[in-house]
């Protein structure tokens, strides 16, 4: 049967979607294996966090979902350390920070009384932010101390209900630290702080002045006075200091601390466990970029890239600075670091590059990505790691999709043909990327072959690989065919709106999909139901056009969805932020590409 959630933690009878349980162990994509492991661990964690101890009311749903998300990483790290699951947590934290940088975000602890308001609480804040804050607290207290506090909390409230206050009290009592003062600043108020770092040498030490304020993507709000304050456990390390971070508690608007050694840079989120953004001086960004690969851990490199991108988003840095840092990490072969960079390079290419500069940007990307592809190779090697397999598929896709590299696109058509003729002959990582790349210039014959695979798939993974290749077709007739197919009885209702949303989030399908939704709204709602319709509302946040924003505003003002009211506000804000970012950075990017992209074109 169709199942709206991925899984459900019923005591003694956990239920799952088939795709979260059934996988070809030999061929299955590593990313799907990780997702399956994560969901299973999440639901098992709910047996304690949610079932044994249950929140008193829905306003504390994060006690269930945040704890289960935090806990789900633990058994996977112990079972498969080679998957580097902690790095995926850091990437996920970056996505959560994006949502929490919107003015329309909410506090973790949020009042809710109606069914629609309650449904809205099951979001990235309840899961992602709550888990990130718990990881920060665990790092601040130490694993053993934090675990002792969790045990005390569970023992005191087992087979009963609890609140956030109950948890803070248990941790404060166990740790003898002011947890009950620190955590409410992250749980009871919305948003995220940015900690600005300024350093100056004083003999053989470095004075580090930290200043905190709330971070907004909205530039006017970010620059306006704001009286919010957090009590922030912050860990730092300097270029001249020890490997072990210096951890302090920032409780005021501005405080100065001293680190050993005279450093030319100070990393403001050492270990990458802090839930905050960091703002650096321009000269420190350059110094950090130079030393990043040698002196920062992969997690710290990801957090640094996230912080620099945030500074670009609010105009503190030109987009060229981010590209320069990415270029400086050109020899980095850590799967998670590269994955994080490629996500932003895709965003830049889709939203910030003008049509006149597209060829230059793609040429720069080919120059950047080709050495990576050469290193990982087109085919797997005996004994290679799961990280290497994942990296190959990710770089392959970026080279074909973002850079439109002719060799990658030719290889994609070849691999797709092999996978369609004999699915067992190709790894699912490469097959999924190849299907999507082949679809870009694909015709009706390829479309029909993918439909046949959807109907005759021997595993849920094969089914979804083919299904979610369909939104990549750029032929207008095939785009329309996918939209009609999505709301037909041939597609399961649990998948229908995600398929429509994926078409809507592709450059070629954006306008046709939105027009389709406007013309077929009653059918879309019938297929997805009132709660699932929020999938479409959230999908509009990928638009970057004032006219389409106005259409979204008019339509969802007339067709309100109670369970997606905040999602709607966030989508409008994301559109506005993108429009503003494009207006601020497009010319700067053109200038940067004039110097770097043109040189790449000439090679």
Label for each model-derived stretch:
Residues 1-214, 218-223, 340, 344-347, ...:
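Hydrophobic alpha-helical and helix-loop surface patches within well-folded domains
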Residues 21, 75, 202, 213-216, ...:
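Short, glycine-/Ser/Thr-/acidic-enriched flexible segments
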Residues 41, 45-50, 174, 233-238, ...:
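Amphipathic repeat-derived elements
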Residues 179-180, 190-269:
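Beta-strand-rich binding/interaction modules
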């Amino acid at each position: 049967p169709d199942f709206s959630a991925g899984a459900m933690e019923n005591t003694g009878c956990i239920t799952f979607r088939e795709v979260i349980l059934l996988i070809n162990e030999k061929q299955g994509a590593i990313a799907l294996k990780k997702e399956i492991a994560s969901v299973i661990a999440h639901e098992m964690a709910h047996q304690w966090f949610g079932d044994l101890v249950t929140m008193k009311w829905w306003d504390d749903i994060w006690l269930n979902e945040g704890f289960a998300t935090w806990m789900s990483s633990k058994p996977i790290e112990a079972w498969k350390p080679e998957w580097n699951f902690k790095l995926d947590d850091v990437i996920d934290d970056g996505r959560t920070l994006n949502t929490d940088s919107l003015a329309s975000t909410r506090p973790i602890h949020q009042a809710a009384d109606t069914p629609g308001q309650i449904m809205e609480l099951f979001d990235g804040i309840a899961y992602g932010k709550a888990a990130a804050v718990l990881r920060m607290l665990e790092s601040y207290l130490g694993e053993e101390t934090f675990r002792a506090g969790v045990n005390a909390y569970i023992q005191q409230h087992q087979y009963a209900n609890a609140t956030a206050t109950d948890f803070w009290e248990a941790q404060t009592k166990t740790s003898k630290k002011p947890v009950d003062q620190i955590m409410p600043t992250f749980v009871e108020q919305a948003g995220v702080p940015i900690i600005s770092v300024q350093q100056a040498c004083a003999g053989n030490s470095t004075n580090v002045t930290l200043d905190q304020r709330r971070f907004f993507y909205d530039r006017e709000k970010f620059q306006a006075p704001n009286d919010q304050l957090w009590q922030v456990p912050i860990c730092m390390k300097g270029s001249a200091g020890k490997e072990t971070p210096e951890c302090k508690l920032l409780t005021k608007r501005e405080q100065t601390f001293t680190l050993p050694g005279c450093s030319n840079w100070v990393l403001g989120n050492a270990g990458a466990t802090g839930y905050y953004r960091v703002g650096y001086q321009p000269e420190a960004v350059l110094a950090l970029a130079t030393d990043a690969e040698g002196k920062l851990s992969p997690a710290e490199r990801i957090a640094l890239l996230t912080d620099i991108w945030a500074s670009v988003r609010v105009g503190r840095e030109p987009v060229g600075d981010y590209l320069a840092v990415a270029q400086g990490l050109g020899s980095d072969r850590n799967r998670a670091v590269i994955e994080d960079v490629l996500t932003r390079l895709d965003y830049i290419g889709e939203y910030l590059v003008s049509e006149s500069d597209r060829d230059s940007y793609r040429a720069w990307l080919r120059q950047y990505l080709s050495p990576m592809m050469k290193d990982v190779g087109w085919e797997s090697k005996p004994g290679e790691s799961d990280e290497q397999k994942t990296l190959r598929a990710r770089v392959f896709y970026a080279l074909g999709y973002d850079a439109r590299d002719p060799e990658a696109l030719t290889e994609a058509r070849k691999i797709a043909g092999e996978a369609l003729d004999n699915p067992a002959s190709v790894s699912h990582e490469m097959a999924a990327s190849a299907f999507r790349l082949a679809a870009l210039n694909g015709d009706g014959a390829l479309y029909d072959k993918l439909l046949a695979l959807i109907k005759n798939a021997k595993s849920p993974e094969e089914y979804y690989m083919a299904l979610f290749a369909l939104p990549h077709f750029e032929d207008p007739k095939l785009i329309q065919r996918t939209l009609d197919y999505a709301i037909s009885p041939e597609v399961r209702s649990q998948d229908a709106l995600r398929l429509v949303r994926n078409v809507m989030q592709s450059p070629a399908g954006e306008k046709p999909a939105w027009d389709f939704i406007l013309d077929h709204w009653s059918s879309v709602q019938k297929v997805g139901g009132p709660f699932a319709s929020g999938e479409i509302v959230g999908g509009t946040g990928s638009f970057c056009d004032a006219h389409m924003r106005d259409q979204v505003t008019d339509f969802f003002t007339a067709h309100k969805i109670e369970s997606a009211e905040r999602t709607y506000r966030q989508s409008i804000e994301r559109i506005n932020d993108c429009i503003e970012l494009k207006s601020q950075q497009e010319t700067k990017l053109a200038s940067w590409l004039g110097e770097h992209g043109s040189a790449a074109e000439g090679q």
